[in-house]
Amino acid sequence: MPDRSTKTTMGTEDMHERKVSVEPQDSHQDAQPRGMFHNIKFFVLCHSLLQLTQLMISGYLKSSISTVEKRFGLSSQISGLLAAFNEVGNVSLILFVSYFGSRVHRPRMIGYGALLVATAGLLMALPHFISEPYRYDHSSSDNRSLDFEASLCLPTTMAPASALSNGSCSSHTETKHLTMVGIMFAAQTLLGIGGVPIQPFGISYIDDFAHHSNSPLYIGILFGITTMGPGLAYGLGSLMLRLYVDIDRMPEGGINLTPKDPRWVGAWWLGFLISSGLVVLASSPYFFFPREMPKEKHEFHFRRKVLASAASTASKGEDLSSQHEPLKKQAGLAQIAPDLTLVQFVKVFPRVLLRNLRHPIFLLVVLSQVCTSSMVAGMATFLPKFLERQFSITASFANMLLGCLTIPLVIVGIMMGGVLVKRLHLSPVQCSALCLLGSLLCLLFSVPLFFIGCSTHQIAGITQDLGAQPGPSLFPGCSEPCSCQSDDFNPVCDTSAYVEYTTPCHAGCTGRVVQEALGKSQVFYTNCSCVAGNGTVPAGSCESACSRLVLPFIVLFSLGAGLASITHTPSFMLILRGVKKEDKTLAVGMQFMLLRVLAWMPSPVIHGSAIDTTCVHWALTCGRRAVCRYYDHDLLRNRFIGLQFFFKSGSLVCFTLVLAILRQQSREASTRTTVKSSELQQL
């Protein structure tokens, strides 16, 4: 904050400018216009782009979560923890940032935070560059081989040594794996720390220096542009996952994989590099914005205000004080306690937190938002993977569905909620009724989702129900002479019986041919003793017979998500109108902190753990459980949609209680008013 002499100088210069402005010539400000870095509109543009790119980089991991699992052998529980770990860094520092408010150079702090976010994105991509090339077939000992040897049925005496032992495992291998995972967790923590100052400092800066009538418009534009970030993240993920993971170090001659192959791993790391570059570009203007800029004057009333200020000395003094009033505002939580030290602030905060938590409306609305946010966090993290596994579609197509349908409908829902609150001037009771209606409709749209999906197809030796005909086991008699690796994964499909084998070896195949058709190569395995007919099977998993159901599923799911998002603005208004005026700033800060701690941190882990319980076949790496290769689709659908249904039901119950309490308070207030009126009439 400027000292007294600085304020006096600023006031003298401002009064001089006002005196000059009444002359026939143009004002001094018009004669010497300030640069674009002293224009709050340019700051709004820059901040919109920065928050857009920040959400791109934070949302990109969710778009490639299943790919990262396959590449580094992670369970869904661990990947969910990884996706939620950026909230750890965010929550650990949010109180300190809220305390400091405008006591620091906010634009520069935003710039430094953005550079940390970009650094975190680069760290997320680092494991790709320090790890060995991806091996999609364990039967080859040469990591850089163009065409990995097929895992064929070979007699034990002819099998290579690598096929009979897990010789690639060592303490060095496990240490390297832990290092890769540790780097990604550190990057996610840094991502959360870097994002701490960006939104609160940006909003407070806009509110301080924008005209009071323009501030809501600017913040609305900011959020409108920002909400496109997750959609762009899923779109970027859709594009990047079509490229092979080792596109920068492809073996000569290419690979024999397509994106439909379950072993396919896309270029997950490339999206982090692109997003990081965009964040760096968006952060560069912040180092040129001033700590404080002149208060924006309303465009249509500027000259009238200038003439009025010149007509009266008293008016000058009032205008001058109003001109500098925003400079005295403290952004964040320090606004209500500017004289407290940091230690005193930390001591006061728990008492204010408990006071607000004892407020029934605040508590119930926050709990409903926790339920909704838990649903959204689980959806954003694992819905692409769910679609990929449930309907046997590619990761790229799953991301495209979310980015093109689900995210836009959520944005429309948020906008509709805001428009309804503004246009209809909804009271707290009406806001709670709107929230209740949105939650109820969202819940109803979720019911059909339990019945739309694909059952697990027959997998030899893994699924128990193989139909009327007895199916082969993992080591049937037809493949007993073969030396098959139990941890190898190179699926083939017997299209005549619609049975999938984990490797050609388990199907008893001894030969392999590659056929060229329409510019594409197709791999076939021949002389398969476990396959009827000509004994030939194509490489790859069996195609799902109900993949077309993904469209009605995602439409219903997206409509439900859009209806749930209608509650965003009215529930926020319930908090603002339901707490004491002096607690509003703290209430909003506590709301976001509680949502992070109770929803955005645990929900991805909860959803990931639920998904892991539906796995029927795990890949093993050095004796430890790694990525899941096959799920029980019916169980996966029931548990994933069931979790979503549970959180939606919790939100509905909370909003029902809020509406009941507000109606009771309204009736009591009406009764008191009637009694007072009767007493006055009697007097």
From Swiss-Prot:
Listed Basic and acidic residues bias regions: 13-30
Subcellular location per UniProt equals: Cell membrane; Basal cell membrane; Apical cell membrane
Tissue expression notes:
Expressed in liver, kidney, small intestine mucosa, large intestine, brain, lung, spleen, stomach and heart.
Q: Which GO terms describe its molecular function?
A: organic anion transmembrane transporter activity
Membrane-spanning parts:
42-61, 81-101, 108-132, 178-207, 227-247, 266-290, 356-377, 398-421, 426-449, 554-576, 586-611, 645-662
Q: How does it sit in the membrane?
A: Multi-pass membrane protein
Source species, domain of life:
Eukaryota
* Domain Kazal-like stretches: 472-532
GO BP terms in the entry: cell population proliferation; cellular response to iron ion starvation; heme import into cell; intercellular transport; intracellular iron ion homeostasis; organic anion transport; xenobiotic transport
Recorded catalytic activity of this chain's protein? dehydroepiandrosterone 3-sulfate(out) = dehydroepiandrosterone 3-sulfate(in); estrone 3-sulfate(out) = estrone 3-sulfate(in); estrone 3-sulfate(out) + hydrogencarbonate(in) = estrone 3-sulfate(in) + hydrogencarbonate(out); taurocholate(out) = taurocholate(in)
- Primary residence: membrane
Region Disordered, as annotated, extends over 1-30
Q: Which residues lie on this side of the membrane: Extracellular?
A: 62-80, 133-177, 248-265, 378-397, 450-553, 612-644
Null mutant phenotype reads:
Knockout mice show no difference in growth rate, viability, fertility, progeny, life span, weight, organs, tissues and serum biochemistry. Knockout females exhibit an increased in Cyp2c65 and Cyp2c66 gene expression, but not males. Knockout mice exhibit a decreased plasma concentration of certain drugs administered orally such as fexofenadine and fluvastatin, whereas no difference were observed after intravenous administration. Also exhibit a decreased in the hepatic uptake of drugs erlotinib and mebrofenin after intravenous injection.
The answer to whether UniProt assigns keyword Cell membrane to this entry is yes
* PANTHER family according to UniProt: ORGANIC ANION TRANSPORTER, SOLUTE CARRIER ORGANIC ANION TRANSPORTER FAMILY MEMBER 2B1
Question: Any idea what job this protein has?
Answer: Mediates the Na(+)-independent transport of steroid sulfate conjugates such as estrone 3-sulfate (E1S), dehydroepiandrosterone sulfate (DHEA-S) and pregnenolone sulfate (PregS) and other specific organic anions. Responsible for the transport of E1S through the basal membrane of syncytiotrophoblast, highlighting a potential role in the placental absorption of fetal-derived sulfated steroids including DHEA-S. Also facilitates the uptake of sulfated steroids at the basal/sinusoidal membrane of hepatocytes, therefore accounting for the major part of organic anions clearance of liver.
Relay the domain remarks. A conserved histidine residue in the third transmembrane domain (His-128) might play an essential role in the pH sensitivity of SLCO2B1/OATP2B1-mediated substrate transport. Transmembrane domain 1 (TM1) may be localized within the substrate binding pocket.
Name by which UniProt lists this protein: Solute carrier organic anion transporter family member 2B1
Q: Gene symbol? A: Slco2b1
